[in-house]
């Protein structure tokens, strides 16, 4: 689950990390009120969307008067921002962040991730702030300094000081950075984060360190023990189909193809997409109904797939282990009847009650094509959508 920048900065502040003064605004009047409460005569206005690249897309503006602030706020709110990280429709701008400006002397990068290779939380710092860290990692990886955090003791002060020296910090800045990095490490673990980025972490002309931007991703598997953070979820920034899938505990990821996929098991789902591509098709989604799929969940999964206008055909690939194939067949037929599916549906059932499931499908007299194997299913659905 992603947080907006203003939410990330609220969390930063609660852990003692320095952030610019500012508030979120949902209309022009709120934006002007926030500006009147700040001591600066210039303000930064930032569109709040779950996507990077806002600056280049016009989602970050520097304003020097309240008239200009009102005009910018009006032009942003209620629109959709398209960046290199969004689709062609962009993300809705329902809120803006109005902040005081600061005089920047230098930009740094500070972040943390769960690193699979070390199976630890790894904190990363770089002198190359203000640019995408992926670009730095690709072009100049030696400029990224990594700290592996021992889960038994957490971030240690000596690690913070060593990192500060590598970043070229001096005197009081080292103390500031140590406090900041320790807070970041504690917050990462306390809040069950999977990603945290401060980019840029700036040094002002007066020598102060400030978190000028913030990005936070929370581990979705840990939300049950993070009720306050869960309440920060903004479903308007998420795909409607993904939200519906989440409500039914379905693992759904939209893709760009034309063949909808419904499979039980993540590995089988990926193999199914591979076979579709092997035979000249393009999958429209990844959808795993899970090992404990019910008739109702299968029916809902099919409805979600059909709601994607790009989908021209559907491949259902079910291996019956825990789940019975006859129940899957009933769910498929119920959904096909309810939604009035006009596109071809190819179904491959294998395992527990597979023969019974196939008989149910064959007797249905609906536009459902039975397949004897995964290869057969892929060939049939690719041929069907090509007609």
UniProtKB/Swiss-Prot annotation:
E.C. numbers: 6.2.1.5
GO BP: succinyl-CoA metabolic process; tricarboxylic acid cycle
Catalysed reactions listed for this entry: succinate + ATP + CoA = succinyl-CoA + ADP + phosphate; GTP + succinate + CoA = succinyl-CoA + GDP + phosphate
Cofactor remark: Binds 1 Mg(2+) ion per subunit.
Stated family: Belongs to the succinate/malate CoA ligase beta subunit family.
Required cofactor names: Mg(2+)
Name the UniProt record assigns to this protein: Succinate--CoA ligase [ADP-forming] subunit beta
Domain ATP-grasp span(s) in chain numbering: 9-244
Example of a GO cellular component annotation carried by this entry: succinate-CoA ligase complex
Function of the molecule: Succinyl-CoA synthetase functions in the citric acid cycle (TCA), coupling the hydrolysis of succinyl-CoA to the synthesis of either ATP or GTP and thus represents the only step of substrate-level phosphorylation in the TCA. The beta subunit provides nucleotide specificity of the enzyme and binds the substrate succinate, while the binding sites for coenzyme A and phosphate are found in the alpha subunit.
Native organism: Legionella pneumophila (strain Corby)
Binding site for substrate: 264, 321-323
Superkingdom of the organism of origin: Bacteria
Cross-referenced PANTHER family: SUCCINATE--COA LIGASE [GDP-FORMING] SUBUNIT BETA, MITOCHONDRIAL, SUCCINYL-COA SYNTHETASE BETA CHAIN
Gene that this sequence comes from: sucC
UniProt entry tagged with the keyword Transmembrane helix: no
Keyword flag Magnesium: yes
Positions with a binding annotation for ATP: 46, 53-55, 99, 102, 107
Subunit architecture: Heterotetramer of two alpha and two beta subunits.
HAMAP family assigned to the protein according to its UniProt record, in alphabetical order: Succ_CoA_beta
């Amino acid at each position: 689950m992603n947080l907006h920048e203003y939410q990330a900065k609220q969390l930063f502040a609660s852990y003692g990390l320095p952030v610019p003064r500012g508030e979120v605004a949902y209309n022009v009047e709120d934006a002007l009120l926030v500006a009147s409460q700040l001591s600066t005569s210039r303000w930064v206005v930032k569109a709040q969307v779950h996507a990077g690249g806002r600056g280049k897309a016009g989602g970050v503006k520097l304003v020097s008067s309240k008239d200009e602030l009102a005009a910018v706020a009006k032009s942003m709110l209620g629109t959709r921002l398209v960046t290199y990280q969004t689709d062609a429709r962009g993300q809705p701008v329902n809120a803006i962040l109005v902040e005081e400006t600061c005089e920047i002397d230098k930009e740094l990068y500070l972040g943390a991730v769960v690193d699979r290779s070390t199976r630890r939380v790894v904190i990363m710092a770089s002198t190359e702030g203000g640019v995408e860290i992926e670009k730095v990692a690709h072009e100049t990886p030696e400029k990224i300094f990594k700290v592996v955090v021992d889960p038994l003791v957490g971030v240690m002060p000596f690690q913070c000081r060593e990192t500060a020296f590598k970043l070229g910090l001096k005197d009081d800045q080292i103390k500031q950075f140590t406090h900041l990095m320790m807070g970041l490490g504690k917050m990462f673990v306390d809040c069950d984060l999977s990603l945290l980025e401060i980019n840029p972490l700036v040094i002002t002309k007066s020598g102060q360190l400030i978190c000028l931007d913030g990005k936070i991703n929370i581990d979705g598997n840990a939300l049950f023990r993070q009720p306050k953070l869960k309440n920060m979820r903004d479903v308007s920034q998420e795909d409607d189909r993904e939200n519906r899938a989440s409500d039914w505990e379905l693992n759904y990821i939209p893709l760009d193809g034309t063949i909808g996929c419904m499979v039980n098991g993540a590995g089988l789902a990926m193999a199914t997409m591979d076979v579709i591509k092997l035979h000249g098709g393009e999958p429209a989604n990844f959808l795993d109904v899970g090992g404990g799929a019910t008739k109702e969940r299968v029916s809902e999964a099919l409805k979600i797939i059909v709601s994607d206008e790009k989908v021209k055909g559907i491949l259902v690939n079910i291996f019956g282990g825990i789940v019975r194939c006859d129940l899957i067949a009933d769910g498929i037929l119920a959904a096909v009847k309810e939604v009035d599916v006009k596109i071809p549906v190819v179904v491959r059932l294998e395992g527990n009650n597979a023969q019974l499931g196939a008989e149910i499908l064959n007797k249905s007299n609906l536009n459902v094509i039975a397949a004897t194997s995964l290869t057969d299913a892929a060939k049939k659905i690719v041929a069907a959508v090509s007609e």
